């Protein structure tokens, strides 16, 4: 099979440049397009040159549909508004769309689900293999430890430039904990504590958010009991782990029928992992 041709959207950003470098270095994939917003100072530049790997003869442009039409897939770590737009273009082009964008609203999620009728979409709050394995462990722990005996708190820290909170990864881990306890996260989530809050409500899942410096991503799920605590953690040291996970997801999705998938499908933790091609 020929190398999978991938488009990098948001090519001028930190993650976009990481994706360009990662795809260029990995076997089985190649960069065939790079997209930036209209008016970006990066338009017209070579994507490889921008990413520091030399000329790769891929010019950064602002015409996604024409580029998508000549590609096999798109890697997307942009903004909610842009991701919804790219999902529509990917559906028109009938290609793979890997989404690592966080901060999506319910309306955004619905638009992406609609696009998945025509595109093969893999979406996750975190593309790293380690975090997705962690989510499985969190679900198992939450199921095994009774809510009356163990409280669940999720602590996350990211760099000072991150704009959404809690992080998509923290919410992914919260959903895993909620699934383990057979509850709805929306009903039991506690995002803010300030002033006189009263005692902790049993069965809730708390979130604490830290921002500062250049931290790539740190997440801990704390199951706190009487006299003991279990802490399940993941520390991201390099954005490349997210890029490699996204490429793995794209290769997994290639040739599969349209639909909406997660990294748990890619890693073989769900029934969808064996979906017929």
UniProtKB/Swiss-Prot annotation:
Compartment(s) of residence: Cytoplasm
EC numbers: 1.17.1.8
Listed Gene3D superfamilies: Dihydrodipicolinate Reductase, domain 2, NAD(P)-binding Rossmann-like Domain
Superkingdom of source: Bacteria
Pathway where it operates: Amino-acid biosynthesis; L-lysine biosynthesis via DAP pathway; (S)-tetrahydrodipicolinate from L-aspartate: step 4/4
One BP annotation, GO: lysine biosynthetic process via diaminopimelate
Keywords: Amino-acid biosynthesis, Cytoplasm, Diaminopimelate biosynthesis, Lysine biosynthesis, NAD, NADP, Oxidoreductase
InterPro entries named in the record: DapB_C, DapB_N, DapB_N_CS, DHDPR_bac, NAD(P)-bd_dom_sf
Gene Ontology MF terms in the entry: 4-hydroxy-tetrahydrodipicolinate reductase; NAD binding; NADP binding; oxidoreductase activity, acting on CH or CH2 groups, NAD or NADP as acceptor
Annotated binding of NADP(+), by residue: 37
Record Pfam families: DapB_C, DapB_N
Binding site for NAD(+): 10-15, 36, 100-102, 124-127
PROSITE patterns for this protein: DAPB (PS01298)
Catalytic activity: (S)-2,3,4,5-tetrahydrodipicolinate + NAD(+) + H2O = (2S,4S)-4-hydroxy-2,3,4,5-tetrahydrodipicolinate + NADH + H(+); (S)-2,3,4,5-tetrahydrodipicolinate + NADP(+) + H2O = (2S,4S)-4-hydroxy-2,3,4,5-tetrahydrodipicolinate + NADPH + H(+)
One Gene Ontology CC term in the entry: cytosol
Residues that hold (S)-2,3,4,5-tetrahydrodipicolinate according to the record: 159, 168-169
HAMAP family per record: DapB (MF_00102)
Family label: Belongs to the DapB family.
Biological function: Catalyzes the conversion of 4-hydroxy-tetrahydrodipicolinate (HTPA) to tetrahydrodipicolinate.
Name this protein carries in UniProt: 4-hydroxy-tetrahydrodipicolinate reductase
Species of the source: Chelativorans sp. (strain BNC1)
Organism lineage string: Bacteria, Pseudomonadati, Pseudomonadota, Alphaproteobacteria, Hyphomicrobiales
């Amino acid at each position: 099979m020929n190398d999978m041709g991938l488009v990098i959207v948001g090519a001028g950003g930190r993650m976009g440049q990481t994706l360009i470098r990662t795809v260029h270095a990995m076997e089985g994939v190649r960069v065939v397009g790079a997209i930036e917003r209209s008016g970006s100072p990066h338009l017209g530049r070579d994507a490889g040159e921008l990413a520091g790997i030399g000329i790769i003869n891929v010019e950064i442009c602002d015409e996604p549909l024409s580029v998508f039409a000549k590609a096999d897939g798109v890697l997307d770590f942009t903004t909610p508004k842009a991701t919804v737009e790219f999902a529509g273009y990917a559906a028109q082009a009938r290609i793979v769309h890997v989404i690592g964008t966080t901060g999506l609203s319910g309306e955004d999620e619905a638009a992406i689900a609609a696009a998945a009728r025509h595109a093969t979409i893999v979406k996750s709050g975190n593309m790293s293999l380690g975090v997705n394995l962690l989510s499985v462990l969190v679900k198992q722990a939450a199921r095994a430890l009774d809510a009356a005996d163990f409280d669940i708190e999720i602590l996350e820290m990211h760099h000072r430039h991150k704009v959404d909170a809690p992080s998509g990864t923290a919410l992914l881990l919260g959903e895993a904990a909620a699934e383990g306890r057979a509850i709805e996260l929306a009903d039991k989530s506690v995002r803010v504590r300030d002033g006189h809050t009263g005692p902790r409500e049993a069965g809730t899942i708390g979130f604490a958010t830290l921002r500062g410096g250049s931290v790539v991503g740190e997440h801990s799920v704390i199951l706190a009991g009487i006299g003991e605590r279990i802490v399940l953690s993941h520390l991201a040291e390099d954005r490349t782990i997210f890029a490699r996970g996204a490429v793995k997801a794209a290769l997994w999705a290639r040739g599969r029928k349209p639909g909406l998938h997660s990294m748990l499908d890619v890693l073989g933790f769900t029934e969808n992992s064996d979906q017929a091609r």
